[in-house]
């Protein structure tokens, strides 16, 4: 029996434990990739099965937690009960430069703290009062976003009307975002709603700071600067002669967002969360966009050359110089870590782009991806994934806690790379684990400098001597 058939049988064994209706539903989300096919063969972006443990988030998480929250010079109000703001408070490690509480506010939590009376009588007056208090207490803020939670949508509060009034009072952008958590099937719709808010409430403004443009102006979009990722990417782009005019949302500002329609090229890192606004700018302003990948030296060089190909010979020559500059550093990293990591197997399950984009970094270290999947991918994500995975790779969409544990128990990977919800489950099973949402409090992982840290962290995870003291359940 081939490996493909083995793994298809594994999927069937897992499905056999479910009731018939659930098994039929989940069977559409699990598959084994077969080389040569142009799709991973799984359904996606569908409501999770009721009653199963899913790692997904909500639309509010996608808007406030991913797209808007990292804009550092704005104050983001979690408009609704206190819990949503509390549990989304500074959890993403979006690094930024500034003085917190004075001119930057990324790690602060602002909430309208809805009470029963606000549900009964509405919260519009309270919200307007909050915007006035914010302006008084934090006068150096450059704008406010209103991130609406579930009750706000259910009672029909007019946050758009409040935003317009607040803008007249403060003279600054006040952006209403209808990202109530019940919308859509995952955080993915929150990304889309947040993108639409940028389109309707930011790009439509005419008060952006005037800047001189150059033929080399670019924007980094969809890099949230986890552990400094955007900084390590920006270094390479600037070394090859490009001018990064805007960087959002990680370490980004509202003015940078306003400037973006003036750039010559949008460089998109997280396709899933920011492709909507990139496509809009392509259609309205004629700005092309390119999805780059700065995970691992192979893809870094490939992306730099592809970006340079969109500019003149000077940029093309500079790109080659940048690649050459880091060859020695990369060779030293590979010489040190590849022998220690060669042929180790990995299973991954994350959101966004990482289930495919991080694969080349593992491959550069000689590691093999045997299973990967997304929390909230769409069909085009799985089409893009075929470029990154090998024959017989297990593919799982919106995988349940039960499925993921069973797959790991059977395939016995050397390393599991997933989120904080999964971290302690697998560590208690005696498996090395890396948290791939926030880089396990390390990073950056982007760029050549980031690859050195990535390699070190994988080595620390896999070759830590403590694992020899713990027996996996299947070895007892």
UniProtKB/Swiss-Prot annotation:
EC main group: oxidoreductase
What does the record give as EC number?
A: 1.18.6.1
Q: Does the keyword Metal-binding apply?
A: yes
Any Pfam family:
Oxidored_nitro
Q: For this UniProt record, give its keywords in alphabetical order, as a comma-separated list.
A: ATP-binding, Iron, Iron-sulfur, Metal-binding, Molybdenum, Nitrogen fixation, Nucleotide-binding, Oxidoreductase
Its Gene Ontology biological processes? nitrogen fixation
* A GO cellular-component term linked to this record: molybdenum-iron nitrogenase complex
* Record's catalysed reaction(s): N2 + 8 reduced [2Fe-2S]-[ferredoxin] + 16 ATP + 16 H2O = H2 + 8 oxidized [2Fe-2S]-[ferredoxin] + 2 NH4(+) + 16 ADP + 16 phosphate + 6 H(+)
Q: Which cofactor does it need?
A: [8Fe-7S] cluster; [7Fe-Mo-9S-C-homocitryl] cluster
List cystine links: none
Q: Which GO terms describe its molecular function?
A: ATP binding; iron-sulfur cluster binding; metal ion binding; nitrogenase activity
Tell me which domain of life the UniProt entry assigns to the organism this sequence originates from.
Bacteria
**Residues reported to bind [7Fe-Mo-9S-C-homocitryl] cluster:** 270, 437
What's the record's note on cofactor binding? Binds 1 [8Fe-7S] cluster per heterodimer. Binds 1 [7Fe-Mo-9S-C-homocitryl] cluster per subunit.
| Gene3D superfamilies per the UniProt record, alphabetical | Nitrogenase molybdenum iron protein domain (3.40.50.1980)
Q: So what does this one do?
A: This molybdenum-iron protein is part of the nitrogenase complex that catalyzes the key enzymatic reactions in nitrogen fixation.
Give the family this protein belongs to, as stated in its UniProt record: Belongs to the NifD/NifK/NifE/NifN family.
Could you give the subunit structure recorded for this chain?
Tetramer of two alpha and two beta chains. Forms complex with the iron protein (nitrogenase component 2).
Q: What is this protein called?
A: Nitrogenase molybdenum-iron protein alpha chain
């Amino acid at each position: 029996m081939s490996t493909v058939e083995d793994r298809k049988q594994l999927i069937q064994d897992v499905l056999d434990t479910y009731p018939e209706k659930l098994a039929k539903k989940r069977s559409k989300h699990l598959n084994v990739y077969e080389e040569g096919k142009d799709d991973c063969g799984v359904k996606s972006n569908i409501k999770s099965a009721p009653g199963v443990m899913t790692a997904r988030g909500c639309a509010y998480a996608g808007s406030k937690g991913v797209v808007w929250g990292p804009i550092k010079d704005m104050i983001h109000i979690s408009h609704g009960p206190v819990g949503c703001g509390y549990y989304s408070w500074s959890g993403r490690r979006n690094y930024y430069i500034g003085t917190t509480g004075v001119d930057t506010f990324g790690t602060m939590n602002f909430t309208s703290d809805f009470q029963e009376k606000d549900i009964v009588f509405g919260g519009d007056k309270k919200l307007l009062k909050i915007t006035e208090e914010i302006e008084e207490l934090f006068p150096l803020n450059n704008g406010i976003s209103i991130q609406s939670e579930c009750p706000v949508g259910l009672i029909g509060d007019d946050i758009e009307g409040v935003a317009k009034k607040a803008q007249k009072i403060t003279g600054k952008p006040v952006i209403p975002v209808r990202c109530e958590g019940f919308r859509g099937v995952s955080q993915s719709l929150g990304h889309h709603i947040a993108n639409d808010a940028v389109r309707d409430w930011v790009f439509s403004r005419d008060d952006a700071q005037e800047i001189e443009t150059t033929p080399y102006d670019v924007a980094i979009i969809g890099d949230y600067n986890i552990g400094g990722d955007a900084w390590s990417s920006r270094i390479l782009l600037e070394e090859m002669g490009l001018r990064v005019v805007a960087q959002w949302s990680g370490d980004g500002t509202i003015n940078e967002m306003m400037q973006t329609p003036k750039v010559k090229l949008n460089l998109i890192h997280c396709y899933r969360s920011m492709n909507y606004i990139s496509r809009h700018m392509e259609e309205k302003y004629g700005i092309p966009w390119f999805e780059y990948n700065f995970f691992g030296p192979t893809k870094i060089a490939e992306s730099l050359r592809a970006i340079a190909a969109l500019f003149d010979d000077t940029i093309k020559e500079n790109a080659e110089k940048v690649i050459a500059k880091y060859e020695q550093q990369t060779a030293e990293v590979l010489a040190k870590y590849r022998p220690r990591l060669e042929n180790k197997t990995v299973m991954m399950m994350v959101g966004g782009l990482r289930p495919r984009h991080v694969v080349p970094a593992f491959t550069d270290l000689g590691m093999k991806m045997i299973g990967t999947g997304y929390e909230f991918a769409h069909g085009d994500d799985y089409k893009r994934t075929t470029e990154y995975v090998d024959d017989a790779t297990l593919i799982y969409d919106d995988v349940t806690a039960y499925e993921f544990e069973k797959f790991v128990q059977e395939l016995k990977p050397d390393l599991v790379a997933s989120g904080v919800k999964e971290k302690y489950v697998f560590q208690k099973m005696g498996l090395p684990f890396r948290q791939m949402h926030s880089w396990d409090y390390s990073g950056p992982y982007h760029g050549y400098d980031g690859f050195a840290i990535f390699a070190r962290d994988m080595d620390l995870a896999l070759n830590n001597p403590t694992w020899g003291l713990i027996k996996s359940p299947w070895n007892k």
